[in-house]
Amino acid sequence: MDPDKRAKLVAMEVEETPPPQPPPPPAKPLPPRALAFLDGPTDEHRVAGLLLLAAADASSLQAHASEIAAKLEASNFLARLLKTAGDDGAALTSAQRAGLEVARALAGTSDDVRDALAKGSALEACGACVLSVADARTMAARGDSIEGGSNEDAAAALRCLDALVGGDPRRLVTSGVDGAPLLAFCRDADEQLWPAATSLLRCCCAGGGLDDESVRALTLLATTVRSKSETYAREAPLIECLALAVAARAGAARTSSTAAHARKAARDVVEEAVPRLLRRGGAREVCRDAALGAAAVCASGRRGAAWLWGRDGAVVRVVAGCAAAEARLALDEALALAAGSGGDDRQRRADRCARVAPLCLGVLERVLRLLLGDDESGDESDDSEAPDAPAPAPDAVLGCRDAVRDAADAALGFCGEARLQRDAAARGLPEAPAPAALELLLALCRPSLSLLGLLAAELDEDEADDGDGDGDGLALHARLAELRPFVDDLVAADRGAAPPPPPATTGDDDSAPSSEVDSDDEIDYGT
């Protein structure tokens, strides 16, 4: 080959290093005298301070979040301001909206600030504000009010409460908001209410805050949103809420009672919808996550086993295949974030990885236990009337096997990369990930190793490591043996002991411990 042509081809194959991400813009200072106004002698001074803070940059609020939260709690002004919101059907004032926006922004800065606001009186005041706005909307619907309860008022109150609650059902109970007003907000066609209202409803359902009448209303809502194109995408989040509500309210109930009929109708709707939602093409990320969450709830318990193996194995093939694909995508996304990719939504993407990967790996672990006949949740009293699981169809077993092996291969590769990133950070190398990214990687190693440990414990080396013939070359035991020191470090870290320093090299080394592991060795991979 011509040397010049060869040089050009080689140059084309050289991977170019992507340009570094531009540094974040410096935080803008708070408006002059904003903090001084919060310490003012009158409420008029504090209102002026809130209005200035509401117009401030988010980064500047984050830099002074603890100080602002302490000032607001010391004067109790924010709680007094919000408790009067929406009285007698009146609209929110500009000061009340500013208070809601500032509280929401402060709660999103850190868990410590959110805890400080939630432990104070701001949480109850925000809950009272949501209820007042809901009452004002009811009055406006009856024609008793013409200005209160607007969509803007409702959106501001719901977003603030969602930020203060932070997904904790106990905080939602403390706020005084139950399922009835949240269901009313979810019925509204306005899209600006939907994200916060659904998030709060999910939290309420997970905490058992919906009574049987509300469960029946949610069932009706979840079945009717499909009929309209503008609400078609709302089905998956509502199905997830319904699955959580039924699971939280599971318990003894007379077969002929209204409660039993409501729960059975809700379960039937959820179990029919989940496979269809998982197969839905072009679904948005939030809809896929909601469908996976509902699938995880449905797969639990004795009833979950019967549901998974139903329809001649069609359900379990869909659930296992989607869980394996989403687990691989989430693990790859976490590695990409550790490598420095991403933009303004890095934190959102990291939060999704931390939520989706363990969820999907847990679903696959449940499927694997059912395949192995190791069902640990088959004696639940609330599933006493659950149908017996049918015998799994052979093609369903093969589909589950392929899905579990695909996820195991992704988990093995992820744990190996996480070990290399951990070693790079320990040596202070320039390519080491940021501390937050490394913490995410190590956190995701635990559910990954839990699945791998179960698979390694149940399969012998011929089944798991066959790379010839019709095998897939997973090499499970050999690759886990290479990760054994890394696993020991994770176990030591979980137990509070300082892990030993990483080895001097990360590649193949003749001086490294032997990777041969006897089958009788007891290795804790997180199971």
Task: Please state what every model-predicted region is.
Residues 2-5, 9, 14, 28, ...:
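Long C-terminal extensions of eukaryotic subunits of large macromolecular complexes
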Residues 2-83, 320-347, 487, 494, ...:
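N-terminal "cap/leader" segments of large eukaryotic alpha-helical scaffolds
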Residues 13, 22-180, 186-196, 203-220, ...:
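Elongated alpha-helical scaffolds that mediate protein-protein interactions in large eukaryotic proteins
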Residues 32, 82-91, 134-151, 322-352, ...:
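Acidic, Ser/Thr- and Gly/Pro-rich intrinsically disordered linkers and low-complexity segments
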Residues 45-52, 95-103, 150-160, 197, ...:
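Extended HEAT/HEAT-like alpha-solenoid repeat tracts in very large eukaryotic scaffold/adaptor proteins
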Residues 55-58, 83-87, 101, 105-108, ...:
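Positions within ordered alpha-helical repeat solenoids
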Residues 253, 284-290, 300-358, 363, ...:
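Extended acidic/polar regulatory tracts at the flanks of large eukaryotic scaffold/adaptor proteins
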Residues 266, 270-280:
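Long terminal accessory regions outside catalytic cores
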